[in-house]
């Protein structure tokens, strides 16, 4: 049963990929959706056995790589953390597959699309079930490849090509850090197996000298692993690929942002909690990075006009919450928020897809408006998703997002307070852009043509069913799972997560946090909704004043252009590397020094040497006798004096002297 959970999506992908032309669009869609749905049902059974029954399962399949001290096997680990991720991945993926049947029905390449979706799901399942770093890395690279294929699905679009290449290249930076971290683990522990590494993590280790600095070995490994999470989970610095990934079909965006790809970094940190717990330095870095990401993405999303990009930046901001929750050693709350976020984020994307599908692929919110009457079901679904996103009381997002902020406050450290206040301010901006999206899309007077609005229709049944199921999850999952996953006195996570006693603050945040601290997120959410209502629905004078102010125009450009991150990266990093590659690597080295010292220089040297030797053939015997006498004299001299000369004369210097003499003579000529 456990193996079927992982390999059923691979089976569906293989059938759709190899036999899609025979099955057709409908047959491929039914095959892949059925396989992923069965995998989802089996995941529920595994959740009951492993998490609720406290019976972790380990499967060793076969040896993979065995070379001296290096031993990696195909193995699968099913513990509480794994089965929670299995439910998230398979349930969201099955709903996205069902949604795609109708959404992609008119696309001639639908079998290829369904094949890519299933292979994406398979690689994510490989990532979360692997029992060693090598298998995790295989799934890690697999989801990167699948995301490239899905973003690049409409390959005739130039922007889709650029977005796919950007996602691949930016993620390569993080993947390089992850690979170095895995190599560091093997160097330190002589294995890549999770159980062995985590068992030895508490043993004191010597420091390493890295870049002339003495670093703690565990801290260096954890920071390198975190660099991998920065790339995959779109943290500050490597986050620029995530909004551009919206160029793919909307079901792809839902799957990437809700269940796969971006959640891989959070899962990896939670899986490696026994390592990170012994590196306070790495935890501080993670906390600061996550807090800055949540603030950066929230401020960027307030002035975006693309419907899907606004939701994409909300994903980036929520990932910041998950990351800094890991940084304050509350991995269970981070994974709980990951699960809750999957429901309402998939709901938001699928609802946005219904609007875009009906509006003939129009994504600019400024060209919409007045759609609430034409899309009553979609409007209700989008409203539920947005309220859950901002942490409206008693919805799913409320039970995890507010807990993260309370935990950050009760950490009572500089990093904790930094994360709390940036996270709280991010709640304000999150509420603003969530309600701005609702107002501009559904409630303001329409900015579209009347004939376009009259042709619009609400989501068909195959697209509505996944949205309704996700809406139910966005309403009730947080309430139902809170006590089980983060409640006091429940050993739900068992040994899958490790928190040292000195870092355990969950009980303190529950009982010691001041009431005003618990109310701040709700107050900020209300304030953000109030500002969004007045700015986008009521205050026309404010909008005119904003448009005519020079400072406001510059502020608008700053946030709308995403803090100029793309421009800075292009101007100072990408362009510098391109210039170095052409002027230094290509011109100066490849076509310059290397070619002169390499093939061209050697051929020229021997040609000039042959010409010089040929000039010695004068035809006079006494010239030849003199040359032989001179050569014999030099040979005897060097032979007799070799012991004294060899200590300060290198043979290579003699060769360079001979070659340079030819170049000197040729230049004089």
Swiss-Prot record:
Enzyme Commission no: 7.1.1.2
Annotated Pfam families: NADH5_C, Proton_antipo_M, Proton_antipo_N
Intracellular or extracellular location(s): Mitochondrion inner membrane
Biological processes per GO annotation: ATP synthesis coupled electron transport; electron transport coupled proton transport
Single GO cellular component term: respiratory chain complex I
Reaction(s) this enzyme catalyzes, per UniProt: a ubiquinone + NADH + 5 H(+)(in) = a ubiquinol + NAD(+) + 4 H(+)(out)
GO molecular function, one term: NADH dehydrogenase (ubiquinone) activity
Principal subcellular localisation of the protein: mitochondrion
Class of enzymatic activity (EC top level): translocase
Annotated InterPro entries: NADH_DH_su5_C (IPR010934), NADHpl_OxRdtase_5_subgr (IPR018393), ND/Mrp_TM (IPR001750), NU5C-like (IPR003945), Proton_antipo_N (IPR001516)
Membrane topology: Multi-pass membrane protein
Function of the molecule: Core subunit of the mitochondrial membrane respiratory chain NADH dehydrogenase (Complex I) that is believed to belong to the minimal assembly required for catalysis. Complex I functions in the transfer of electrons from NADH to the respiratory chain. The immediate electron acceptor for the enzyme is believed to be ubiquinone.
Miscellaneous field: Exons a and b (AtMg00513) and d and e (AtMg00060) are cis-spliced, while trans-splicing reactions are required to link exons b and c (AtMg00665) and c and d.
Family: Belongs to the complex I subunit 5 family.
Assembly information from the UniProt record: Complex I is composed of at least 49 different subunits.
Protein name per the record: NADH-ubiquinone oxidoreductase chain 5
Organism: Arabidopsis thaliana (Mouse-ear cress)
Gene that this sequence comes from: ND5
């Amino acid at each position: 049963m456990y193996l079927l959970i992982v390999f059923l999506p691979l089976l569906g992908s293989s059938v759709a990929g190899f036999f899609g032309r025979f099955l057709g669009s409908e047959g491929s869609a039914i095959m892949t959706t059925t396989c992923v749905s069965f995998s989802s049902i089996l995941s529920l059974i595994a959740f009951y056995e492993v998490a609720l029954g406290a019976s972790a399962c380990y499967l060793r399949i076969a040896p993979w790589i065995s070379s001296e001290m290096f031993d990696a096997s195909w193995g699968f680990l099913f513990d509480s953390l794994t089965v929670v991720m299995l439910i998230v991945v398979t349930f969201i993926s099955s709903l996205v597959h069902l949604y795609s049947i109708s959404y992609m029905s008119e696309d001639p390449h639908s079998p290829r699309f369904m094949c890519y979706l299933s292979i994406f799901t398979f690689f994510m399942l490989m990532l979360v079930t692997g029992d060693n770093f090598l298998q995790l890395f295989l799934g890690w690279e697999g989801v990167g490849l699948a995301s490239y294929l899905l973003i690049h699905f409409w390959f005739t679009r130039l922007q889709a090509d650029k977005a796919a290449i950007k996602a691949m290249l930016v993620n390569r930076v993080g993947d390089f850090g992850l690979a170095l971290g895995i190599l560091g683990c093997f160097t330190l522990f002589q294995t890549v197996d999770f159980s062995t590494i985590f068992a030895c993590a508490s043993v004191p280790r010597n420091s390493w000298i890295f870049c002339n600095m003495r670093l703690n070995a565990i801290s260096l490994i954890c920071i390198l692993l975190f660099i991998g999470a920065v790339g995959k989970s779109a943290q500050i610095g490597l986050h620029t690929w995530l909004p551009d990934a919206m160029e793919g079909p909307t079901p792809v965006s839902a799957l990437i942002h809700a269940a796969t790809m971006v959640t891989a970094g959070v899962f990896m940190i939670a899986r490696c909690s026994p390592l990170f717990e012994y590196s306070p330095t790495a935890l501080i870095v993670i906390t600061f990075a996550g807090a800055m990401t949540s603030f950066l993405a929230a401020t960027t999303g307030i002035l975006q006009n693309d419907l899907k990009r606004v939701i994409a930046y909300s994903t980036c901001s929520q990932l910041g919450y998950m990351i800094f929750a890991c940084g304050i050693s509350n991995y269970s709350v981070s994974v709980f928020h990951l699960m809750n976020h999957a429901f309402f984020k998939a709901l938001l994307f699928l609802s946005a897809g219904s609007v875009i599908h009906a509006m003939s692929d129009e994504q600019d919110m400024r060209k919409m408006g007045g759609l609430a009457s034409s899309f009553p079901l979609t409007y209700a679904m989008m409203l539920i998703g947005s309220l859950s996103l901002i942490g409206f009381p008693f919805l799913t997002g409320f039970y995890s997002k507010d807990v993260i902020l309370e935990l950050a406050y009760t950490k009572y450290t500089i990093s904790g307070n930094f994360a709390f206040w940036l996270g709280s301010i991010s709640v304000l901006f999150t509420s603003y852009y969530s309600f701005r999206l609702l107002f501009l899309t559904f409630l303001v007077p329409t900015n579209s043509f009347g004939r376009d609005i009259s042709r619009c229709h609400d989501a068909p049944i195959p697209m509505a069913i996944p949205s309704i199921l996700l809406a139910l999850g966005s309403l009730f999952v947080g309430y139902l799972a809170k006590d089980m996953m983060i409640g006091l006195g429940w050993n739900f996570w068992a040994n899958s997560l490790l928190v040292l006693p000195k870092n355990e603050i969950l009980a303190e945040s529950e009982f010691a946090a001041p009431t005003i601290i618990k109310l701040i997120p709700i107050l900020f959410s209300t304030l953000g909704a109030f500002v969004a209502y007045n700015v986008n629905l009521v205050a026309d004078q404010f909008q005119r004043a904003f448009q005519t102010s020079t400072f406001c125009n510059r502020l608008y450009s700053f946030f709308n252009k995403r803090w100029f991150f793309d421009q800075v990266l292009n101007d100072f990093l990408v362009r510098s590397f391109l210039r170095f590659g052409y002027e230094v690597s290509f011109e100066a080295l490849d076509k310059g020094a290397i070619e002169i010292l390499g093939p061209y220089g050697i051929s020229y040297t021997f040609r000039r040497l042959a010409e010089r030797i040929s000039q010695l053939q004068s035809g006079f015997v006494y010239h030849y006798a003199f040359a032989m006498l001179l050569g014999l004299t030099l040979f005897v001299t060097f032979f007799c004096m070799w012991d004294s000369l060899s200590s300060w004369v290198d043979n290579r210097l003699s060769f360079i002297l001979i070659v340079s003499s030819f170049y000197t003579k040729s230049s004089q000529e």
